[in-house]
């Protein structure tokens, strides 16, 4: 199975307990195996017991240390729109594995137990189950952020092609870098734009002359092709972020 895109979050214990609801995730199970207390390592096995492909899930991780300290965190995994479109997902009857590495808060305070609970699962038909609404919201926010970043590239290339500059790739790159300097609204939610990723996209557009040459087209033709590809990707990601929670 291909590696999922993973994010980790530290959660306050009270908040985690408050967000959990009575509706359990029924489509999959999580089991901790290969636990090594000395190293603080373990493997989480996620089994898809539903009849649908799973494209994302969120795990609540509870770690107990020797000195009775309890840490709670969340691991979110998502196959992403492109991989899912290629049929890559956690298929029915399939088991996915994820390695955990827990760091002790201080020397000698070793890990005594690790518990993993599935708190949100998203299926390929865009429906979802969740016992933690905020965990499901974070999956939606992650997917929405990806769509927003691709749309930023679409806007940059569109503006470059509509302008008068002959250096189209550099123009698109500058538009992206200027956009990154714009402060994010204070009431914005979710992870927002990844500055590192968008700088990577800007660097990609700066290489437009080389990329166009490799396709044996002009720079304008190359960016026009890329615009079509990016528009399709943005639409795919936007649809991917539209998740419906299953009743019950």
What does each model-identified segment do?
Residues 4-14:
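Sec-dependent N-terminal signal peptides
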Residues 20-43, 49, 58, 148-152:
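Low-complexity, acidic Ser/Thr/Pro/Gly-rich terminal tails and inter-domain linkers that flank the onset
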Residues 45-53, 63:
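Asparagine-centered strand-capping/turn motif at beta-strand->loop junctions
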Residues 53-60, 70-74:
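Short, hydrophobic/aromatic beta-strand segments
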Residues 67-109:
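Intrinsically disordered, low-complexity Pro/Gly/Ser/Thr-rich segments with frequent PxxP/GP/PP motifs
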Residues 106-125:
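Short, surface-exposed ligand- or partner-binding patches at beta-edge/loop junctions that are enriched
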Residues 130-183:
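Charged, amphipathic alpha-helical linkers/stalks
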Residues 169-248:
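A eukaryote-biased signal for long
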